[in-house]
UniProtKB/Swiss-Prot annotation:
It catalyses: hydrogencarbonate + H(+) = CO2 + H2O. Zn(2+) binds at H130, H132, H155. Residues 37-296 form the Alpha-carbonic anhydrase domain. This is Carbonic anhydrase 5B, mitochondrial. Keywords: Lyase, Metal-binding, Mitochondrion, Transit peptide, Zinc. Its cofactor is Zn(2+). It comes from the Eukaryota. SMART domains: Carb_anhydrase. PANTHER family: CARBONIC ANHYDRASE (PTHR18952), CARBONIC ANHYDRASE 5B, MITOCHONDRIAL-RELATED (PTHR18952:SF25). GO terms for molecular function: carbonate dehydratase activity; zinc ion binding.
C-alpha cells in the first residue's frame, strides 16, 4: 500500500526510530501460478523498484503485509457483516504521481466519505486510493489468493478519526487504518476507470499533480459483498502494523489498454533518466500466527453444490 505525500512517503520517520533488524530472509513466498506463464518469486521480484532492493531489511514485526490468502485456511466468521460505504464525490481533490504509484486524494476533515461495518468498530474516513501493478499481466497485485496473482490491485486507504487526530498519527498506531483491497483482472472495458486513465498522461512524471474533482471510488468496487480480513501493515516504509486489511473476494474487470496506460507512468522526475513505473508492489510476507477471517462460507465461494442422491425411480437400470 503506497503512503502519500502527507506522510512524505515514509511519514518522515527515520529508520532509527523503528524496530528494524537485518536478518536473513528465507524464500517463504510460494510459487505464483498464472494462466499466461509460470510466475515465480524470483522472476516477479527481479525488476522491483529501488524501495525493495535490500530485501533483508525487514521490521521486527509479526503482522506484515501483503500475504498469500489461502481459502482452505481462512476461517468463516458469521459475525463479519457487510461493509457500509458512503463516499461523497465532492470530497475528491486531486490525482498525483508520488514516485511509487498514482494516488487520488480526498478531503478528510469531516465524515463525508467513510466506511464502517465489517471488522471495523468505528467509522473510518477515506484519505486516498491508489493502485499496484506489474510490468506484465502475469503479476502486479500485492496480495495473492492460493498463490494466484492478479495484474493489479486497488487500495482504498481510510483512517480512524474517532481515536486519532490526524491521518499521520493513525498510520503509526494499531487499528489506525483500514484498507480495502480490490483485485483487477483482464476483461471488459471499465467505463468509470477510464476517467482516471485519461488523466494519467498529465501526471507521467514523479511529483506531478492535477486537480481531479467529483469522483466516487465506490464505482471501482465489485458488486459481491464477500471479503477476507486480517491484521497487517503498511506495504511501504515505515511498514507500520496499523492496518485492518479488507480484501474483496471478487475482482473487477479492466481491459488491457487501460492497464497498459498505468505502465506509461514513470518513477522518475522530468529531466531524469526515465524508469517505467511497473512492479510497484512489496514482496509477500509470512502469515506467522495470524488468522485470516472470511465473511463467507467456503462452499459458497467455491460454488460447491451438493446434488441430492437420486431416488430408486430415477436410477436408470
Amino acid at each position: 500500500m503506497a503512503v502519500m505525500n502527507h506522510l512524505r512517503v515514509i511519514l518522515q520517520v527515520s529508520s532509527s526510530t523503528l524496530p528494524w533488524r537485518r536478518c536473513w530472509v528465507p524464500r517463504l513466498v510460494p510459487r505464483r501460478s498464472c494462466s499466461l506463464y509460470t510466475c515465480t518469486y524470483r522472476t516477479r521480484n527481479r525488476a522491483l523498484p529501488p524501495l525493495w532492493e535490500n530485501l533483508d531489511l525487514v521490521p521486527a514485526g509479526d503482522r506484515q503485509s501483503p500475504i498469500n490468502i489461502r481459502w482452505r485456511d481462512s476461517v468463516y466468521d458469521p459475525g463479519l457483516k457487510p461493509l457500509t460505504i458512503s463516499y461523497d464525490p465532492a470530497t475528491c481533490l486531486h490525482i498525483w504521481n508520488n514516485g511509487y504509484s498514482f494516488l487520488v486524494e480526498f478531503e478528510d476533515s469531516t465524515d463525508k466519505s467513510v466506511v464502517e461495518g465489517g471488522p471495523l468498530e468505528h467509522n473510518y474516513r477515506l484519505k486516498q486510493f491508489h493502485f499496484h501493478w506489474g510490468a506484465i499481466d502475469a503479476w502486479g497485485s500485492e496480495h495473492t489468493v492460493d498463490s494466484k496473482c492478479y495484474p493489479a490491485e486497488l487500495h482504498l486507504v481510510h483512517w480512524n478519526a474517532v481515536k486519532f487526530e490526524s491521518f499521520e498519527d493513525a498510520a503509526l498506531e494499531e487499528n489506525g487504518l483500514a484498507v480495502i483491497g480490490v483485485f483487477l483482472k483482464l476483461g471488459k472495458h471499465h467505463k468509470e476507470l477510464q476517467k482516471l486513465v485519461d488523466t494519467l498522461p498529465s501526471i507521467k512524471h514523479k511529483d506531478t499533480l492535477v486537480e481531479f474533482g467529483s469522483f466516487d471510488p465506490s464505482c471501482l468496487m465489485p458488486t459481491c459483498p464477500d471479503y477476507w480480513t486480517y491484521s497487517g501493515s503498511l506495504t511501504t516504509p515505515p511498514l507500520s502494523e496499523s492496518v485492518t486489511w479488507i480484501i474483496k473476494k471478487q475482482p473487477v474487470e479492466v481491459d488491457r489498454d487501460q492497464l497498459e496506460q498505468f505502465r506509461t507512468l514513470l518513477f522518475t522526475s522530468e529531466g531524469e533518466k526515465e524508469k517505467r513505473m511497473v512492479d510497484n508492489f512489496r514482496p509477500l510476507q509470512p502469515l506467522m500466527n495470524r488468522t485470516v477471517r472470511s465473511s463467507f462460507r467456503h462452499d459458497y465461494v467455491l460454488n460447491i453444490q451438493v446434488k441430492p442422491k437420486p431416488t430408486a425411480s430415477e436410477v436408470t437400470p
